[in-house]
Amino acid sequence: MAQVFNFSSGPAMLPVDVLKQAQQELCDWQGLGTSVMEISHRGKEFIQVAEEAEKDFRDLLNIPSNYKVLFCHGGGRGQFAGIPLNLLGDKTGADYVDAGYWAASAVKEAHKYCTPNVIDAKVTVDGLRAVKPMSEWQLSDNAAYLHYCPNETIDGIAIHEEPNFGNDVVVTADLSSTILSGPLDVSRYGVIYAGAQKNIGPAGLTLVIVREDLLGKAHKACPSILDYTVLNDNDSMFNTPPTFAWYLSGLVFKWLKKNGGVAQMDKINQQKAELLYSTIDGSDFYRNDVAKANRSRMNVPFQLADSNLDKVFLEESFAAGLHALKGHRVVGGMRASIYNAMPLEGVNTLTDFMVDFERRHG
């Protein structure tokens, strides 16, 4: 079978070693004669899977002991509701930074529960899309929390600063597309959430990291399945969790630890992004319209100078084993998502193809 590199934005490529282990264990896990998908989530065998996954996740991110880790349903969109329902308390407003599509989606959901103070951080610098630095964000005086999305997968825009607003500001962040891809100081945040389907594992699982002093504040109308306190008190098993996704994510955590952890991922991700952006910037045939300071390392959108060639590019790249390069319908063009599981070899293969395609069609 020919090598295929999957550049999908999510569900995304998983480490080949993890897939092979899951394949090997699929029908007979731990000698039980059954699949891990079939065993009880309350049995001692799966409890061990769950505990090891949380421990490895904590180790990878050096999560402080005063933070709880929840394994949840609902994805990022579920947390768009979960954040206000758990954190508003007796306040009626919260600060929301809008830097792109997913941040705006969080704002839309927040309007159901509060009056969001929307901080429009989108700017244009020398004709390129960019984001205002955090020092220019105008926070309100009585906000229950601040919400932002550091990496916009559709727009290819990233906020590389980590928040430093002081202890009075409860910072919440959607890290679905960047978690485990580089250094992260968890102590700067009140709540971090991430859908698993990009850098953690398969779709269906969402991880929430919540500072323990923020528990116990959920609105009385908050569904129990979104209530952080209920989930924490029940060890993320208030109802049957997505056990197979939890198991696979645990395998990914072990793969990460075996391969140098977050520090090594950070190094490789930087190499991949630099290679791809340098190929785009060194050509008049391809272009990226994001300012260099705000370019995403995970999601690289680019356009061809002649959009009439888009269909040909996608057909030829797919035939070459380079899959899922079509850009999101909102922005068009192409997009290469290069999360942790994408090896440097995959980006090398893509850039070689891009150079050759330009030679033949430019």
From Swiss-Prot:
It is found in: Cytoplasm. The keyword Transferase applies. It catalyses: O-phospho-L-serine + 2-oxoglutarate = 3-phosphooxypyruvate + L-glutamate; 4-(phosphooxy)-L-threonine + 2-oxoglutarate = (R)-3-hydroxy-2-oxo-4-phosphooxybutanoate + L-glutamate. Coiled coil: none annotated. Keywords: Amino-acid biosynthesis, Aminotransferase, Cytoplasm, Pyridoxal phosphate, Pyridoxine biosynthesis, Serine biosynthesis, Transferase. Its main location: cytoplasm. InterPro entries: Aminotrans_V_dom, Aminotrans_V_PyrdxlP_BS, Pser_aminoTfrase, PyrdxlP-dep_Trfase, PyrdxlP-dep_Trfase_major, PyrdxlP-dep_Trfase_small. L-glutamate binds at residues 9, 42. Its cofactor is pyridoxal 5'-phosphate. GO terms for biological process: L-serine biosynthetic process; pyridoxine biosynthetic process. Belongs to the class-V pyridoxal-phosphate-dependent aminotransferase family. SerC subfamily. This is Phosphoserine aminotransferase. It comes from Enterobacter sp. (strain 638).
